[in-house]
Amino acid sequence: MSQLKGRAFYWRTLPRSNDGFPRRARDLAHEFALPERSRCAFLQSRPRRLGCGALLWRQTIAHGPSERMTLDEIRSLTEGDLSAVDGVIRARLKSAVPLVDQVAEHIIAGGGKRLRPLLVLLTARACGYQGNAHVEAAAFIEFIHTATLLHDDVVDGSSLRRGRHTANRVFGNPASVLVGDFVYSRAFQMMAALSSQPVMEIMSEATNVIAEGEVLQLMNAHDPHTTEQRYLEVIYRKTAKLFEAGAEVAAVLSGATPRVRQELAAYGRHIGTAYQLVDDVLDYRSNPQERGKNLGDDLAEGKPTLPLIHALRHGDEQQRVIIREAIQRGGVTQLEPVLTAIEATGGLEYAARLAREHAARAKAALAALPESRCRDGLAALAAFSVEHTT
């Protein structure tokens, strides 16, 4: 990777409007529909340069006129709910079958940001919920996410996640698939225990959509003709749908009105889309040690993500040939010229801009909620979705 040093993807210093929002000349036609002087202003931070030309966003957001909220500060708004979720996760992963316990311990030790449970907890509290069912809901949302990761790593042949060997690398593909099934079914046991038909309807539909997304991604693999629309359909189904479902479940448990429920579902959908768009940018511009994944993993798996799709659409003939062949063959032997083509065509910048637009829409949806610290936390998560670096 030493050859990649010096190829840092620079963002110009962004001039700001009177409202404090960053502007760039090339983006003046893409003004965001943000509420004027919103209480939690959407902040675009200047990146910092790390090794391998990392494209990074600081994990802070504007809170009020002068404060900034870190991710840990966002977590603190749940007042112990996240700790309760961790306890539920550990308890519900217990099994009389030793191998299940071993894989479960490997999963727990792997950690994670717990963004989806955090979204559920904050949404419920922002809606005024006073019970405890949101803790179970946050846990089963995380279980669905965990099950999909276990299966994804098998399908993709991944060996590294969060800087550690994947479960399939340690225990083998059969064990990883079967324990994924266990985690998935345990999630539905927990849903059933809530005795809420609307929750079951939301989650059964969501898991079906997620499964379809996995198949669509499989169909797109090694296909250089994948369009932006097809790509966005995949990330909605694979990633954004679970965020959407988590926010909607929290609204249902809180007894929110249909309008609020709809707005919160939109919030989850947009924040999930933004998060995945940035994740796909980071695949080409990140610090592998910090992120816990190899640079160019998507390219190695032949996944035509948005930076590649944009470069194919706007590159010259030589660049298009290089990218088409790289997608078709997979692997990272062409990573260097692919990076050059992506940077020359603004592919990373384009994907990041689209992510910011979705984050802005997520934040706008929060207008349906009354002002509160937890609503501020949800706005902070919208900013984090485009600022995360791992």
Which stretches of residues belong to each language-model region?
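All-alpha prenyltransferase/terpene-synthase fold signal
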Residues: 3, 23, 36-44, 50-390
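N-terminal amphipathic/hydrophobic targeting modules at extreme N-termini
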Residues: 2, 29-30
